Amino acid sequence: MAVEPGTSEVRRQHRFDQGSLERYLCRCLPGFPQQPAGALSVRQYSSGQSNPTFYLQKGGQAYVLRKKPHGPLLPNAHKVDREYHVQKALFSAGFPVPEPLLYCSDVSVIGTEFYVMQHVQGRIFRDASLPEVGPAERSALYLAIETLAQLHSFDLRSLGLQGYGRGPGYCRRQVSTWKRQYDAAAHTDIPAMNELAKWLANNLPPDDDEEALIHGDFRIDNIIFHPTEARVLAVLDWELSTTGHPLADLAYATQFYFWPTSLNVLGQGSVFNFKGTIENPSFEELISIYCRCRGISTTIPNLNFFLALSYFKMAGISQGVYARYLIGNASAESSHEFAKMVKPLAEKGLELSKRLSFSSIQHNTSGELFYQSRKGQEVLLKVKQFMKQHVYPAEKEIAEYYAKHGNTEERWKKPPVLERLKEMAKAEGLWNLFLPAVSSLSQLDYALIAEETGKRFFAPEVFNCQAPDTGNMEVLHLYGTEEQKKEWLEPLLEGKISSCFCMTEPDVASSDATNMQCSIERDGNSYVINGKKWWSSGAGNPNCKVAIVMGKTKNSSASRYKQHSMIIVPMDTPGVRLIRPLSVFGYIDEIHGGHFEVHFNDVRVPVSNMILGEGRGFEIAQGRLGPGRIHHCMRSIGAAETALEILCQRAAQRETFGKKLYHHEVVAHWIAECRLSIEQARLLTLKTASKIDTLGNRKARKEVAMTKVVVPRAVLKVIDCAIQVCGGAGVSQDFPLASMFAYIRTLRVADGPDEVHLSTIARWELLDQSKKLTAKI
């Protein structure tokens, strides 16, 4: 039998009656192997400084047991019953925690209360710099911060955890509690602890009434990651969980960026000897990720208080661990090391308290208007190099493939050179750059990359960043169940399959999405889909294996915006029919898999294929379309740059009436106007991306609508000027301008026509103006 990593024989001070435990589990734990499945094996985890934790194994089944320590304990500490109940609530809500199986309050079984949970197989990283993994994965792992944001977004009532905490005043109680517990455990006087406690008590944040479910000890070595992927499987150690201010968790999770250089050891390894690098997100980037996920501003007042509180708390924990060591009741072998940590931790807390504020966005001294992360700069440079070395040279071969197969079924397949480029990009880590959870890039970072890929229409697919797959992957990432992610998101992320999105319908005015007629009706353990869709981009690709379909679910009592749902439909499901490809200004657009009319006739899929729940379709659509519209716009700006380049080359090569075209003032003015249009469009798009990063999708709705109107108009103007300078050649197959124009023109209709976005802009503008007026509009 393989030994569980990180375990040892049960330490003498934590031994208990294993026979009694085995008999109890045989009686009370469903599924626990009965005799004669072999003896129960018990080993103790070497990590963990609080509640002793044990690995149980019998008959091929593995469990984890957490118990109270023996002997005298600090007041109100080691509440394993609270750990069990909060994990049970979170597991039921789909949050990544080990499944809690059983709680035992009968101290006669093993001498203390305990609970048992399912063992989760995965990786735990004890060193925050993650030396065990490669650079690309290392940065993605830090997006465990998304998991923290998810935790803080839960409604306590929906979890059934009303009364779990003690109500408003969390920060005040924390200062008081940790001061009291430190005083009870102190073995010597440390002036810095007293001074820090006094400062915290006198500088409580004004919003101390904010309440969310918080973990209390959220850090990377309390997280189990997937064995091979950068994915969180379980968050551990809920002993300190309660309801309180979420920024306390955020500060605690990011405190290692400020860790005292004199402290290289915390139990095991150089856990906090860490600074941000190109591969590791900076403190500012982690804060930005968290704020983006929660939809809050990245300007965080009082962050110095929460960081100082984190160090005060760490000092108190360290003192408590050492106190248990002195009485022979420590949970870990390295507990004696903690005595020397209290003073440096307190001093660091005092240092942080003197910082007036922390901003998640660093002030840029390079002259750039928008902040681009270090990793964003690095990836953008790599993408530019890849485009120059591999993508541009492949353009001719790809064009020849589609010209050769334009009237055959081969046109729906991908050119071999494109598949080779995809493998090369994937090998270089230039893959799935659009998804923050994978790339660690902000929307602003990706906006600049999307512009670069937009310079060639086939380039986004090289990096697995093509629509509609990007939007579908975002939907599954944000709203899909673990089962849905495993079956569909993972192969999409790997580039093994493609997808289509079915929303627009031929028989209704789709600019008002509530007109939708496609029905999704519950029938036992299935949903039945009936309806017609068109402009389903990518459906002609032979590799298109799944569609996300939006339709109406029967709920007459709900508002008109809560009657629609999104559901996953495998393309090989009986009743799914591809009717015809739709042309765009005469182009079939084979390179993007075409734009198909698709009919769904009595299509039956399992209930588990519903995304997020009935009536949540518009909610999902808004989450999907916000960033997606920005991605389209930035790619369009890349196309505009290509068109302007063609314009200038033509103007420099051709002569009329005895002089170069660019010497004609009208052409020179066109060139200038095109540059103005591109720069204006880019600035608005980057502002919108930055606002999504800092305030979230909802707060950026006005800017998203403005960008969606402005950019296609500006780009069409540039392409039209380029066509005019090129003359007849500009509308021929010898130049990409005609197909560019056709594609960009569709963006004034796709993802909502200009008129819908203009109405949105006007509505938000009136609301903004009304705040400035005394009379209500």
Swiss-Prot record:
Its EC number is 1.3.8.-. FAD binds at residues 501-511, 535-537, 654, 724-728, 753-755. It is an enzyme of class 1 (oxidoreductase). It is found in: Peroxisome; Mitochondrion membrane. One of its GO terms (cellular component) is cytoplasm. One of its GO terms (biological process) is fatty acid beta-oxidation using acyl-CoA dehydrogenase. GO terms for molecular function: acyl-CoA dehydrogenase activity; flavin adenine dinucleotide binding. Its main location: other. Substrate binds at S511, G626, P627, G628, R629, G752. SUPFAM superfamilies: Acyl-CoA dehydrogenase C-terminal domain-like, Acyl-CoA dehydrogenase NM domain-like, Protein kinase-like (PK-like). Belongs to the acyl-CoA dehydrogenase family. Acyl-CoA dehydrogenase, that exhibits maximal activity towards saturated C22-CoA. Probably participates in beta-oxydation and energy production but could also play a role in the metabolism of specific fatty acids to control fatty acids composition of cellular lipids in brain. This is Acyl-CoA dehydrogenase family member 11. It comes from Gallus gallus. The lineage of its organism: Eukaryota, Metazoa, Chordata, Craniata, Vertebrata. The gene is ACAD11.
